[in-house]
Structure formats: structure tokens, C-alpha cells
């Protein structure tokens, strides 16, 4: 099902050719989003994100740089779990992991690029391959947050990339190399 994401009022993620990192924007306003924020009635905020290849947890405006893996300091795609207790991130050249808010690794997910939380127990990302010049295959995969279960949602022949999740509807959107945006609705 092809849908105009602006009409869906969901977050869109896209990659700019001149930059190496993924930018997210609110589809309704096109306002850039750099992080997820969870707020409580007391006004406290907790955010997890990556900036300049650093993994950062921000609590009420106070930033703390995490170093969950000893032999790397380059991180991408950091995000806070829906329950606010864990951080999902990719260590460049190492793989994707889940850690607690202090940086203790809780699970190794393995190779999964552009990972996003689907819900508190599942993650969606892409498993892509290239030949050095262009993408040769890319599938959208759902993985349990402990890394033990894996399910292919879109086969690699589709060259499905950069999944985005709308948690309230349970839908997953991804783009193809041709520029199409496809929306999946998972059976409950």
C-alpha cells in the first residue's frame, strides 16, 4: 500500500546525499526532529539520541555521553525505548545493541541498520548489502529486544530501506530505492 506520509501525519525519515546521518521530520509540519522526548506531568524530560557520532542521554536538559562499548566511540541511530528504560543504538562497524540508561549493554541485536523501536519488546530495522557502489539488497526485519528472535517483514528483493514506525497505529513505513514509500499494517 503506497501512501502519502504527509497525509498520515507520522514521522518521516530520509537520508540526504551530502550527509551521512539520517534526519527525521514531523510529516505534518516538516519540522526537524533530532530526538525522542518523553515527558511526565511534572515536566521532566528524558531523551536518548546520537549527535556527532556520540550516544547521549539527556535528562531535564543535562547531557550525559555514554560509552557502552569499550573499543568504539562512534554511534548512530540512538533512541529511547517506549517505556523509557532502555536505549537502542548502532555502534559503527560493530552492530546494533540495547543498553540501560547508564550504558550497560543488555542485548546484542547483531547487524541491523536504521533500527527503531516498534514497541517495548520489538525493534524494526533494515538488513542491507551493497557492492561498494550501490545497494544490492535490503530487507525490513523485526527483532526481539533481547536479540533472540528475528522475522523478515519485507524480503531483500524489495530493497526496503529506512523503516519508520507509527506506534499508535502499529504501522511500519519504509522507502524503496525508486523513492516509493510503502506502509505495512501488521496483523495483531
What are these regions (language model features)?
Residues 1-188:
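Sequence signature of WD/YWTD-type beta-propeller architectures
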